[in-house]
Amino acid sequence: MAQRERNREERGREERDSEFVDKLVHINRVAKVVKGGRRFGFAALVVVGDQKGRVGFGHGKAREVPEAIRKATEAAKRDMIFVPLRSGRTLHHDVEGRHGAGKVLLRAAPAGKGIIAGGPMRAVFETLGVQDVVAKSLGSSNPYNMVRATFDALKHQMHPKDIAAQRGIKYSTLQARRHDVVGSEE
């Protein structure tokens, strides 16, 4: 009886996990120096998302690569954030993020533009569900700093309704202003 319940729980966990897409961003061989020499292990950086606006990243370390990836994936699923997307495909506004010496600039893009971003940032956008974005990384090219800077930028992403509420104006007024500005640029 207990075995059946355990199997049911595992199936439920697998169904929940199947909704997520995970991408391995970086794997690194690390060494711990001990009295007898060096002990080698692996560190993995993984990004996990549901391609509907939820995304997280995790770091895992272990003696074997698959175990490091599993730990990183579990850490990423525990620490996810929600990012509001415009039309489910791009960002609402341009934003900048920083972490350490890494700095990233994220710009909303028109439909059909695609994901124009370098390595670690591309993995974040693909798992997030963004289809059109232009991103530029400045400073550090360390994958850990780039991913953390990207998450810093995404945390500052706000829905226009929230911006309108902060400013004390109607959402429709904000949208009208946005269309006036976008229309004058073309």
Swiss-Prot record:
Q: Where is the S5 DRBM domain?
A: 20-83
Supply one GO CC term from the record: small ribosomal subunit
Q: Which InterPro entries match?
A: Ribosomal_Su5_D2-typ_SF (IPR020568), Ribosomal_uS5 (IPR000851), Ribosomal_uS5_bac-type (IPR005712), Ribosomal_uS5_C (IPR005324), Ribosomal_uS5_N (IPR013810), Ribosomal_uS5_N_CS (IPR018192), Ribsml_uS5_D2-typ_fold_subgr (IPR014721)
Annotated coiled-coil positions are: none
Q: Which GO terms describe its molecular function?
A: rRNA binding; structural constituent of ribosome
Q: Which UniProt keywords apply?
A: Ribonucleoprotein, Ribosomal protein, RNA-binding, rRNA-binding
Q: Which GO terms describe its biological process?
A: translation
Q: Which residues form the signal peptide?
A: none
Primary role: With S4 and S12 plays an important role in translational accuracy. Located at the back of the 30S subunit body where it stabilizes the conformation of the head with respect to the body.
Domain free text: The N-terminal domain interacts with the head of the 30S subunit; the C-terminal domain interacts with the body and contacts protein S4. The interaction surface between S4 and S5 is involved in control of translational fidelity.
Quaternary structure per UniProt? Part of the 30S ribosomal subunit. Contacts proteins S4 and S8.
Q: Which family does it belong to?
A: Belongs to the universal ribosomal protein uS5 family.
Q: Which HAMAP family match?
A: Ribosomal_uS5_B
Question: Under which name does UniProt file this protein?
Answer: Small ribosomal subunit protein uS5
Species per Swiss-Prot/TrEMBL record:
Brucella canis (strain ATCC 23365 / NCTC 10854 / RM-666)
